[in-house]
Structures are given as structure tokens and as C-alpha cells.
Amino acid sequence: MALSQLQCLDNNHVNWRTSEGKAEFFYSEEQRLALEALLSQGVDAFHGVVKGENIRDFLSELEMSRVLSRLEPFDPDCCHCRPDGEEGDEGIGEQDGAQSLEYWPDRSDCSIPDLDLGWPEAFAYRGVTRATVYMQPPVDGQPHIKEVVRKMINQAQKVIAVVMDHFTDIDIFRDLLDAGFKRKVSVYVILNETDVKYFLQMCEKAQMHKGHVKNLRIRTVGGSEFYTRFSTKFKGSLGQKFMFVDGDKAICGSYSFTWSASRIDRNLITMLSGQVVETFDRQFQDLYLLSKGVSLKNIPMENEPEPEPVLQTATVPTAVSESIAKKLINPKYSLVKTKSASDTGAEKEKNSSNCNNMATKPKPKPTEQPPQEQKHPALHNMEKANMFDYLPTWVEPDPEPGSDILGYINIIDPTIKNPHLSQMNRIKIWDTSQATAQFLLDKEQELKQTECQKGSETSQEQTSSKVETHEPYSEKEKSGHGYSETTTVKKEEESSENLVHTSKVDQGRMEHSPSKATSLTQVSQQNQSMDLNEAEKSPSQSRGSKASQTSQGKESMPSNSSGVTLGGQTVSNTEESSVASPGPYEDLEKEPVKDTVDELEDTSIKDPPLENFESLLKSQHLIIPSNTEPVTGPPVPKPRTLPVADFINMKNAQNANIGSPSPCLADSIMPSVNGLDTEGTEDTTHSEKAEEDSDEGVQYFSSGSGSLPPSSSSSVSEEYYLTTSVQRRNSEDPVYNGEFFPVQRKMSEGHISRGSFLSPFHFRQTVMDLGQMENGQRRNPGLEQELQMAMADRHPMHGNEMIYSMEPTQGKPVYPFGTNGLSPSYERLQMHRQAKNPGRARGREESTGVLRGYPQIRNPEGLALRHGFWGPSHAANQPSPLTSNPMPAEHPSTPFGIPFSKLAQAKHLKTKMGASNLDSRRRGHGYLGHKDQ
């Protein structure tokens, strides 16, 4: 029914009276009367109504002819069910269902269209609208409109919906068939009812088969219908032309899918994408609901062929450089063989045939030529690697019982399939920790032959002039118990040119470090008297003393210019110049190794007691070998050292009868007393953590270098690790194994640490540090002798009790390391320090956390944290983790035997003197006064 008629049936609609000259003019009752006159009476009646109603002539001759040709009688029962066996018009398919005879129809205007092949989901927003217009003929280099349509069909993946008035282009139709059959794309086509016969003729020419119809739906629809009062009607035609693809693209315009429209007619199309496509989506569903199906059963079709496999084009790899191509091919992969897909498929076929137990002949497979291996041009002339040369070797753990051999490495010739032991090259793997027994025997025989060749002392002097390189291969030092096991060293004679070169290097070293050689020589002279007594009891030590005397007599020689005597042994900066006799090796070879306790008892009975520093120097614990030549001997295990503190505690009882030292300090030199230098600054030292032994209650300390943390089970000697240089530590560093006292110094000042060797005074100080330079001069060696004798006079003490005397005297200050008073030069030092910083004593007296009247140590992490060192009240009030019963003395003193009362008097003297003796030449790095800050 026409729109004007539908509007008249609406009760709420009001036809506003408008003239023909307005844009809103649409419905006209006069035009309806003229049209009915044309359909009932003809053309003359039409013109008579137009003149009588005084309206415009709105129909052309072409339109009059089309309306008259489409006129048909209206039968109200034409839409009902037809009797069985009655067929409808040609071209109308069975898809039209039977109409209902009831009042309420089965179908309504709002029915859902039957899109059985699928339809893309509706999206709330389809994106930004974009439009592109293409012309026919093309302009500005644009592609042809037919090319644009075909490309869009070939790119479709989901659905293609076409609404067309004339569809006779066979090329476009073949593209639709291929999309539906090969790519399984749903294809819907809606055509004009009057032109469907031309479409069916094209289908006969397209050589269709039954597979093309599976994903193809063809339907027809016409225009709106106009009903008259004389039971007649006529229908319009479908003039819409658009194509909807995948729910996101659409093409519309004047272009019809015909040859003439793409070649000779002028048309245009508009490609749309985005949100505007939603209009085409709804319009197609409405047209599909109103359309009728078209049957294609009268079109001759062939059977559906087998689907052709989709040929995937082999991608040619891009050319790579020669260097990369050589890296990609690794010869390791030639040893790996994996099963291909064909091999696994053949195995499955065999298994299935065995299960079925059917004797079926296998189908002959077409012979396929093996694909040629593709090689990079850079790899054509390369040799194939023999992977047997790259096979790894392995260790067979089959050594003989009781031997030092851990196993063998077998090297097998790859050309021999089953090699025997005679055809293998074996490499023995020895245990380095126990493989020195045979080596000692060989070296002992060599040394015996060497001693036999030396007939007299003249021959010995000739051989000693030659440089003999010694390589220590095994050394076990136990300095804590006076026990030392040394093995022989390997000797290699060098040419005379190397002798001259070595002597020059040694002389240069002595020139650059005169202080070090002087200090070591002075210490050795102090220990010569003790070595002579020891030489009478032990023949092995007598040899060492003779060697030391011989080396002292030859200090002028270039070969021995770099050697120094320490504890009866001659030590060189490059190598040890003395040759040990084979005596110790016989004892080491014949006598088995006993327990440590037995060895300690034997050594304590045979050997006389040694001084504390002398034992350390004798063990050469801090001598750093400067040998630069490569080691050719067997690997040397690390020497094992025992704690020094145990040895000192055990020998304290035997050192009580030794005479007190006589101080011989020079008046012109200000010595370093109580950790203070000549400028009034404090020699700050780091204190090591002490671990408490739960069984014995004895403190153990490591003798390792500063680069390693202290440990009770240290097996590291400073012969293998250099001492660390001066380091700085801030006050924020935590202190473990003790109470934390408040920091009494500036936070910005760094703390200087010297070395890491833990001396018997419980702070780090190496033997080499005793000979440091002060004001360009050497420290007085008398101080070293005084400290050594002070160690000898002390009583045996344990734990923290070592800092207090067990038997304090009345009216006399007690010194834990001796009974000597203050040295003459100490008062001059205190007066000099008081003149240096007059305001320092006042700041110390006002400080809290220590005893009033006693100086406060600048380093709270050093000696101040040792319980009972500087504050006996702390040791009395607070429990110490190191000892359970500390016994503070009535008059505590410093470790160097200086009472605190004397230090307090020196402070007052310093304050009285004022700034008269201020030294402006040098400013110390210690605590600054209030004015200096």
C-alpha cells in the first residue's frame, strides 16, 4: 500500500493543507483521483481530471506506460495456501511457507529475517565514518569501479550482502561463487523481481556446480504497491544498489553489476566505513524479510568436485651475511637425529595394520625426489666437521687402592670401534694434598747428592754465589705452639745474567725502603741472644742460626743485599737464600704425624720458651714473598696456622722470670706512647671481633690479613695475602659482640685503620707497622724492646682478665703488661700535647659515658668497646659476653703500662702552658678543639 494510503489509515495523522510549491508537499488527494482515472478509464480521463482539479501534470509518458504495464487485479485470496500439487509461478522457490488462515498471522511486520548462513554481530560503535568516491570513467588516476568491487569481494572473510536491480556481470558473480565455496563466506543476493529472469540466464552461463549453492542465497523483492478502489493494484521496482561486506564496509551508488554500467555508462560508487555502515545493515535485514526466495533447481549443475588444496607459497628466506650464515650452522647438530613426520606416520600405519590383522597391500606411493639441501653461498666450499673430534673426555674413577691417583682421563682414537687399554692414552689425576710423598723422596735424594758434591767451605761459598731459585711446595706453620714443619724447596740454577739483574733489583728495593730493612735488622739483633741458647738444644735450629750468621756476614754481597734476618732465619724479598739441610725431611718421612696435643707437649719440653714477638717473627708470619718467577713445582696447599692468643696465654707463666728492659729512648725523638703520635693526634686502630669458645672460654683470633674477616678456624697466612692499606670507616658502622657506647666524635671524620693483624694487645697492628715513620724519622727501637719485655713480665691471664693485675699493690699504680713507670720522654710528650690543644681537656672533662677525669678514646669502636679496658665500672655493672667474672683493678692503666692518673695530670699541665708551644707547622688529624671547629 502506498505511503499516502497508510497515512490516511492512521487516526492520529492529520494531513496539513499544503501547496505544491512547499517542500513538505507529499500527499495530494487530487493526484490520487487522477491516477485512478488513468488506471480505470485511460490516458484521456487522466488529463481531464488534471484540468478539472487545476493541478500540475505529474506523470510522463514513460511512467504512464510502466504503470499501465504493471497493473494487475487484486485477489484477496491470492496469499492463502494453494491446493496440493499446484505450483506457483516459475522462479518462485519452496522457501515461501504456507500462509495462515487465522486472523492472527504467523508472520508480522517485525519478524526476524531468516539469515540462516550467519550474520556479523551488531556493534554499538563501528568507528569513524570514512567515505571514498570512485567515478566511471575513473578520474585523477583512480582505479576502475569494477576493480574496486572485485577487490572488496576477494577480501571478504565473513559475509557479503548484495542488493542490486540488474545483475548480469559474470565476472563479479564468479567471484561471489569462489568466495562462498573456497573461503566459506556467506553470500546473500537480493534482486529486483522484474529482472530476475536475466540473472537466471547468467547463472546458466557461469558453469555452476552443486557446491556453489551451499553458501549462496538468492531472493527477490519489488517496490511498494498501490491499491485502487476497483480491486486493482500495481507495484514498483527495486532501485537500491549497494553491497555490504563483513559488517564494517559498504559500497553504494549508481553502478549496476552489468557490463554496460562498467564500460559505457557513467556511474559512481561511494565506499563507506565506520558508523554509517549500520544503516546498510538494517536496510538489508528489512529487505531480506520482505523478499521471496528464488529456486535454482532448473539451472543445470555439475557434481561438487573435491576441494582443491590451498597451495601455500614457500617463503624464500632473506639473504644473510656470510658471518651470520657460518654461525647459524653448528656442527653439533649433525650428531642429533630426530624422527620426521613421515617416519612417525609410517610407524602409526604399521601399528594399525598389526592391530587389525588384515593383510592389505599398501598403496603404492608416488616416488618423490628428495628435496635438495639449500646452502648459503658462503658455505658451499666449507669442509664438513668431524664431530668425533669434538666428543668430550671423561674421568674413569678406577685408581688402585692406597694410591694418590684419583682417576684417569681416557683419550680414544675415534677410528677404532672397540679400543683396548693399550690403544688408549691415559692421563693420571693426582691428589694434590697427598701427592707430595714421592716428591719428597726424590728431592731428598737430589739434596743428598748435592751435599756430597760440596766438599769444603770454599765449594759452598762458590755455590752460594749462584742464584738458586727455591719454590716452596709444602709448608705447615703452627706459630701459636712453636711448632713448625718445613719441607725442602726446589732449587734451579740460573745464568749469571739473571744473577746481576736480580741483585740490581734487590738493591733498588733496599734503596726505596730503607726503613723497613733497618727495623727488621734491629729486631733480629735483639733476638740473636735467644737464638744462641736455642741452638744448643735443637740441632735443626743451630743450622738456622749458622745460616743467619753467614747471611749477616754477606750483607755486602749483591745476591744477599735484600735479605734480612728474622728469628734466626734469613729471608729475602725475592726468594729464601738459605738452603735447608735434609735433616727435617728424614724426620718428616720416618716419623708419622701425631696429634696436636702430643706435639705441643714435646715441643714445650725440648725447646726453650720464646718471646711473644720473637715467636711471631720466627714464624715469618708477615713476610710477603716478592717472588715474581713462575712456580714450577707441585701445587702448594695453604699453610695452617693456630691462634696466637693460645700460645701467648700458655707461655705467660714461663716469661715471669725474664729481666725487665732498660729503656734507651732518644731525647730528640718523641715516641709513640699510648697510641698517640708527636702531634697530639691519636693512633686509631680497629678492634677485631672475638668469638667466645664455649668449651674452654679462651678467645681465638685469626692471623689472616685484613682482606679476610677474622675467624677462629682460619687457615690463611699473610704470606699469601697482602696486608691492606689504610682504610676509612665511618662511625655509623655497627659493632658486634659487645655493648654499643655512644659516639663521642664528629660524624664527618673518617676513622683510619692500620692493617689487620691481631696483636696480643687485642687490636690490629702488624709487625711491619711498628717501624712506621714519624716526622720523617724512625721510631725509637727502644720502645719495641720495652714492649717486648713488658710482654715477658706480665702474669698469665685469660679473657678480659688480661687487662687487670691479679695482685694489685698498695699505693702503686698497677700495669697489666709490666711494673715499669712512665718513660722520661712521656712527660715531654704530654706537655707538648697540652700546648697543642689547650681547650681539649675541658671538652673531655665535660663529656659523659666514661669515667670523669680520664681521657676519652676517639674511636668508640676500638679499644673503648673492650669490656674493662677503659671503664671498669662498665665491666662491673654490665655482663660481658667474653668472661663471666671480670676483676677490675683499683688503679686501671693503659695496655702500655701508663696509669690514667698520669694522663689526667698531663692534661692539666697542657692547659696551664696555654698556646705558648703551639706548633703551626703541622695540624693533626685527630680530635679538633672548639676553636678549630
Swiss-Prot record:
Main location: cytoplasm
Coiled coil stretches, renumbered: none
Domain of life: Eukaryota
Cited InterPro entries: FAM83, SACK1
Compositionally biased region (Basic and acidic residues): 467-480, 503-514, 590-609
GO MF annotations in UniProt: protein kinase binding
Gene3D superfamilies in the record: Endonuclease Chain A
Function: Substrate for type I BMP receptor kinase involved in regulation of some target genes of the BMP signaling pathway. May also play a role in other signaling pathways.
Similarity comment: Belongs to the FAM83 family.
Complex formation: Interacts with SMAD1 (via MH2 domain); in a SMAD4-independent manner.
Protein name from the UniProt record: Protein FAM83G
Protein's organism: Xenopus laevis
